[in-house]
């Protein structure tokens, strides 16, 4: 089953987590504090992101009970490619409209 990245990233808390993880790895507790949600809520958000392949987790070497979460930027490549297509389409449409208006004003 394909992952609906829009559904995964529709939640503002998950988008904030993705932004934070884009800077560096975090433990779940650090993310809870940074975002301002409870630990159980953060666990649910991280589960969604893990299942979608947006983040990975690994045990820390010094304490196997702690997990570090990292962003998988490549997981967002499909979304980025789609957004690039949409942007190119609208750039073309707006350029065409601009040329039409300029011709109308000159004529």
Regions flagged by a language model, labelled:
Residues 1, 74-107:
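Amphipathic alpha-helical dimerization/coiled-coil segments
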Residues 2-41, 66-77:
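N-terminal helix-turn-helix DNA-binding core of bacterial DNA-binding proteins
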Residues 7, 19, 50, 80, ...:
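A cross-family signal for key residues in well-ordered alpha-helices
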Residues 12-14, 25, 43, 85, ...:
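Intrinsically disordered, low-complexity regions enriched for glutamine and histidine
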Residues 27, 38, 55, 99-102:
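Charge-dense, helix-prone N-terminal extensions
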Residues 30, 50-65, 70:
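Beta-hairpin "wing" of winged helix-turn-helix
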Residues 46:
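DNA major-groove recognition helix of helix-turn-helix
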